[in-house]
Regions:
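Alpha-helical transmembrane segments and their immediate juxtamembrane cytosolic regions
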Residues: 5-303
Length: 303
C-alpha cells in the first residue's frame, strides 16, 4: 500500500498562542505494522507452549521482554481518538465482548484442566474479578488495551489542552489505574503511551522505528545480561525499540509470498490471540509423539 501524502490539519490551543500542526493521514493498513504484528503474535504462541518455553528459558526471557511491549506500542500508535462516541463504542464492544467471553471460558477451563494458572472455584465473583480486574492467560493484553484506549479516547476527545498536556493527563490517569487501582501494570501502559506519543507527533511509524542493522550490536549486548530482560526497565524499552528496528531490516529481505502471509496473519491477530490458549492446550497431545527430539523443533514446526 502506497503512502498517502494527504494531511489533516489540527489546531492545538495553548495559553497566548495557537500552534498549527500537520498530522499525516493514517493509512487503513500499514504493511510493515502488519508484518511486525505477525512476528510478535507468532513469538507469543511459540513461547506460550510450555514445552518450548522450558527447553529455552533464556530465549523465552528475551522474547518476553519485547514481544508484547512492541504490541502495545503498535496498539497505541494505531488507536483512533478521532471517531465519534458511537463509532468508538462500537469498536470498544467489538473487542470487549469477545475478550469477556474468552476470559470467562479460560477461567472455567483453568478450574478443570491442569494448567499453571489454576482457579480453585468458579463463582460469579471470580468470573467478574477475572474479566474486569485481574485477567488470566494472554488476555491481560486485551484488558490493558481496553483500559488504555478508553483513557486515551476520553482525554483526547474531551480535555481541551495542548497535545503535550493531554499526553501528560493520559499518563497520570494510566498511572492512577495501575498504582492505586491495581487494574494493570504501569510498565505495560507506558508502552501504549509511547505509541500514542509517536502517533501524536505526526511522524510515520517507520520514521521513528527505523530499520538499521546497527541495532544488532546493542541488542545482543543488552540481552547478554539477565538484569536487562525486564520490560519495566529502561533496558527493556531499549530492547523493544531495537527488536522492532531489527525486524524491519529483515522485512526488506523477505520474498513476496512470505510478506503476503505475514500481512494476512498480522491482520488477524485478534482472532489468533483469542483462541491461542485452545491451540496450546491441544498441542500437548502431540508431546509423546515428538519426545525423541531433544531440541523440540519438530514439535514446534509440525502442524
Amino acid at each position: 500500500m502506497q503512502n498517502i501524502n494527504k494531511f489533516t490539519e489540527v489546531y492545538i490551543f495553548v495559553p497566548s498562542i495557537t500552534i498549527r500542526r500537520k498530522l499525516p493521514y493514517m493509512e487503513s493498513r500499514v504493511k510493515e505494522i502488519d508484518y511486525l504484528k505477525c512476528i510478535f503474535i507468532t513469538l507469543m504462541i511459540i513461547f506460550h507452549l510450555v514445552y518450548i518455553g522450558d527447553k529455552y528459558p533464556y530465549a523465552k526471557q528475551i522474547v518476553y521482554t519485547f514481544h508484547m511491549s512492541a504490541f502495545l506500542i503498535i496498539s497505541g500508535y494505531l488507536a483512533n481518538n478521532r471517531k465519534d462516541a458511537r463509532s468508538f463504542l462500537r469498536k470498544f464492544l467489538w473487542i470487549f465482548i469477545p475478550y469477556a467471553c474468552m476470559e470467562a471460558a479460560y477461567t472455567v477451563m483453568s478450574h478443570f484442566l491442569p494448567v499453571r494458572e489454576s482457579v480453585d472455584a468458579i463463582t460469579p465473583t471470580v468470573l467478574l474479578d477475572k474479566i474486569f480486574l485481574h485477567p488470566m492467560g494472554p488476555y491481560w493484553y486485551l484488558h490493558t488495551l481496553i483500559l488504555c484506549s478508553l483513557i486515551y479516547y476520553i482525554t483526547f476527545r474531551y480535555v481541551r489542552l495542548s497535545v503535550v498536556s493531554r499526553l501528560v493527563v493520559t499518563g497520570v490517569c494510566l498511572f492512577a489505574l495501575s498504582h492505586w487501582g491495581g487494574l494493570m501494570n504501569f510498565s505495560n501502559a507506558l508502552y501504549f503511551l509511547i505509541g500514542m506519543t509517536v502517533s501524536q507527533s505526526g511522524l510515520r511509524f517507520t520514521q521513528v522505528f527505523r530499520a538499521t542493522t546497527f541495532a544488532i550490536v546493542p541488542f545482543v549486548i543488552l540481552c547478554c545480561f539477565p538484569a536487562n530482560l525486564d520490560r519495566g526497565t529502561l533496558a527493556g524499552v531499549a530492547i523493544t525499540w531495537l527488536s522492532i528496528s531489527l525486524l524491519l531490516v529483515a522485512y526488506g529481505y523477505l520474498p513476496v509470498q512470505a510478506k503476503r502471509l505475514s500481512f494476512f496473519i498480522g491482520r488477524n491477530t485478534l482472532v489468533i490471540l483469542l483462541f491461542s490458549p485452545i491451540f496450546t492446550i491441544l498441542s500437548k497431545a502431540f508431546l509423546p509423539v515428538f519426545a525423541f527430539d531433544p531440541t523440540g523443533m519438530l514439535f514446534l514446526v509440525t502442524p
